[in-house]
């Protein structure tokens, strides 16, 4: 038991500090912006300090455990803890949120509320990744939806209310299944509700009941990940949201679904997972092909990037379904890798829109000469998205491939077939990615417009882009840093789960 509440401070600090925004003096938006960025940077540094000095990477058990009785009547505890599975997403959350608040610098309308919602979202996401109690997990899952809905409905495009309503209907519908699963596991087999992750992991269920629990949790996480056919909220949401909100959606929100699949479906419901894992491979493979093909037909720039995100999530599903150390490590690496690449692409799409006020690719063209810095950065991240060797996406997708090939669970012919179809998906990725760059940056549509109408990337945008690019390059060159966090925990999940 940890005696100093590091994790509680890390979870509560952003929303508590965010609530103080409303009491700041009325001296313009600059004070609010700097205050929010200071809180994000301080939170990120505090998180990094805590993990550096109080977390042992070679220990697969839960560390920094905190357990406080919260509601006596339900035996509900404020129970936090981290392990190799959660430390990566928590650091990713801090990094992307800090950059998203910097990206939101131009937002001036209701900036107090906007920045408070960003910080409230920060708290909910870190709370979800560090929770060790099923009901606390559900509360953080729900708490995170409210800021996203408000950010969508108040700071978005012309169809923002439609996309916000669609988002909340999909995610709230999925949350019903999550709540049913949480209550089912909590109330099963004892007079006292047992919501502790450790107790639930050691609990055995009748197979039909475990399958029902698995399907309930799977639907909830499939909406958030998203998994086809529950993905249609994502392109509409990304198409209308402000690009700083898109950075949080692509960088962190989608990863919550993947984290839930590993943390609950794989760790707590291992027998059902071994039954459904072949179906995960099939769904993941179809998703890679379908989303890549659909992305190619999108006229809207942000919707094309959104479908590319759906395609890349297919690799995470396949890695989770492979039931191998290699495949699961590859899926966790893809979670981190796509967090940076997806956030960067949406940021660049948003800054481009700020300049040319166009969202349809067939109306663009010839921007490369007018904005060479944005062209260079966008092209670089497009290469990272299509898994260029030396970038993080290449390592993640390659390791997922190896995970499928080395899996002992599947016969040779299905493995060859799935690998072949995945390879087709990887061929489609450069087609839609390079086509997007060609339509935006080449051609003559903007060639004859005087340069005074446009300005290239400024210092703030360059700093943001470089900050997102360095981790992509660093992970691509040295992925062992990420693996060192998760490899022991992955071994424990697979050995405990599938030897029961």
From Swiss-Prot:
It is a multi-pass membrane protein. InterPro entries: NADH_Q_OxRdtase_chain4, NADH_Q_OxRdtase_chainM/4, NADH_UbQ_OxRdtase, ND/Mrp_TM. The keyword Acetylation does not apply. The keyword Transmembrane applies. It catalyses: a plastoquinone + NADH + (n+1) H(+)(in) = a plastoquinol + NAD(+) + n H(+)(out); a plastoquinone + NADPH + (n+1) H(+)(in) = a plastoquinol + NADP(+) + n H(+)(out). It is found in: Plastid, Chloroplast thylakoid membrane. It holds the Pfam family Proton_antipo_M. One of its GO terms (molecular function) is NADH dehydrogenase (ubiquinone) activity. Its EC number is 7.1.1.-. Its main location: plastid. The chain crosses the membrane at residues 4-24, 35-55, 87-107, 113-130, 134-154, 167-187, 211-231, 242-262, 272-292, 305-325, 330-350, 364-384, 386-406, 416-436, 463-483. Keywords: Chloroplast, Membrane, NAD, NADP, Plastid, Plastoquinone, Quinone, Thylakoid, Translocase, Transmembrane, Transmembrane helix. GO terms for biological process: ATP synthesis coupled electron transport; electron transport coupled proton transport. Belongs to the complex I subunit 4 family. This is NAD(P)H-quinone oxidoreductase chain 4, chloroplastic. It comes from Coffea arabica (Arabian coffee). The lineage of its organism: Eukaryota, Viridiplantae, Streptophyta, Embryophyta, Tracheophyta.
